Regions:
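Conserved acidic donor-binding segment of nucleotide-sugar-dependent glycosyltransferases
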Residues: 322-331, 338-343
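A short, active-site helix/loop in glycosyltransferases that binds the activated sugar's phosphate group
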Residues: 141-193
Length: 381
């Protein structure tokens, strides 16, 4: 079966092969069981590309099966529609990463089966991008909602949130996170508990994994919370940020509040090295204004970290209600950080490590592959 994936991500052509970011590779790898993959993606042409484009696509997408289009913002250009239309004509199944209305219409016009891959809330994404984003959010939200509702198949990354916001009449749909966690080892939990028991009860290392130049990721609210705690005499909380992007805005904010010595930028870290950093932290914070199901939070849970998160998207699906903060609330974050105890860290280590088992590769792959089998059988019957 020939499968076309139209993805709102970037691919780079380098040394006679194609390269993409690890998270994009993971997405594409999971679709290989459906058949022969072709890809429509944005062309990546930035410096230091090896830091981001770190996985070769050979074996997932054949060299002559990558076609470049511009990233889809509001609507596709006429030129890109023509390119996608040509690719669709050679496919049996069209998958749109993000549920693009334009890709949906092209597939429908050619009588091709269409799958929406719903990874985040488009409303939150646009609404949190200033006045222009708020202006177009209702329009793009309704288009996306229509697309998902009328798709032949839908794959969600949440268990509940995106399903409620973007319901579907699809023949088959599945809720399955795109987190990648290998089999969990009880030694990880034991090491976490030993780490907690050595804690002095004051000095705390907290961490967020997200790009540092995207404001809707919310790191600024954690910095403001630290400022509130500093005013209360707490200067022993250190905030570590894992992720690429310009640091200018957050550095200015930290300087304004006199928190430069408490803010630590670790940059982009290879995925296989992230866990060793998480093992040195006490609390993971996910203050986002837009998410699907945050894989970084699940990864933190798999290391037994206590997690705090905003009431955004599927974050409340992952953690207990008392650790969910109001969106944009530095006060809520400060209150929770100030009240952390050793007993709380131990309880949450057990709870979160157990919850992370639901997101192991073997569990999710089985659920996803069962869904893919239904899709294949429906198309090939």
């Amino acid at each position: 079966m020939r499968v076309l994936i139209v993805i709102n991500q970037s691919v780079e052509e380098r040394d006679n092969s194609y390269w993409c970011a690890s998270n994009v590779y993971d997405i594409l790898r999971r679709f290989t069981c459906l058949g022969e993959l072709s890809l429509c993606a944005d062309r990546y042409n930035a410096k230091k590309s090896h830091l981001l484009m770190d996985r070769e696509l050979t074996g997932v997408v054949a060299k002559n099966h990558v076609t470049y289009i511009n990233k889809i913002r509001l609507r596709m250009s006429q030129q890109d529609r023509a390119i996608v239309s040509q690719c669709v004509s050679q496919s049996d199944l069209v998958i749109s990463h993000g549920a693009s209305y334009d890709v949906f219409r092209i597939a429908r016009n050619q009588g091709k089966k269409f799958m929406s891959f719903v990874v985040s809330c488009i409303w939150d994404g646009y609404w949190n991008h200033g006045w222009l984003g708020k202006l177009v959010a209702p329009y793009i939200f309704l288009l996306t909602r229509y697309t998902v509702n009328h798709s032949d198949y839908v794959l969600y990354v949440t268990s509940d949130f995106l399903q409620r916001r973007y319901p579907t009449q699809a023949k088959y749909n599945c809720g399955c996170s795109n987190v990648r966690i290998t089999t969990l080892d009880e030694n990880t939990l034991n090491q976490r508990l030993a780490f907690i028991r050595k804690w002095d009860g004051r000095t705390m290392r907290i961490v967020t994994m997200a790009a540092v130049d995207i404001k809707y990721k919310g790191q600024q609210f954690v910095i403001k919370a630290m400022h509130q705690l500093k005013q209360q005499g707490r200067t022993d909380i250190h905030y570590y940020l894992i992720g690429g992007g310009s640091r200018d805005y957050l550095e200015r904010l930290a300087k304004e509040y006199g928190l430069e010595s408490q803010l630590h930028f670790l940059g982009k870290i290879p995925h296989d090295e992230v866990f060793s950093v998480l093992d040195t932290m006490h609390v993971y914070v996910q203050p986002s204004l837009q998410e699907g199901l945050p894989r970084s939070m699940v990864e933190a849970m798999s290391r037994g970290l206590m997690c705090i998160g905003a009431d955004t998207a599927a974050i409340p699906e992952l953690i207990e209600p008392q650790f969910v903060t109001r969106r944009r609330s530095a006060t809520d974050i400060a209150r929770l950080l100030a009240s952390v105890t050793t007993e709380q860290l131990i309880t949450q280590a057990h709870r979160n490590f157990k919850e992370a088992h639901h997101y192991e590769d073997t569990v999710l792959d089985q659920r996803r592959n069962d869904f893919f089998d239904k899709v294949k059988n429906d198309i090939l019957k």
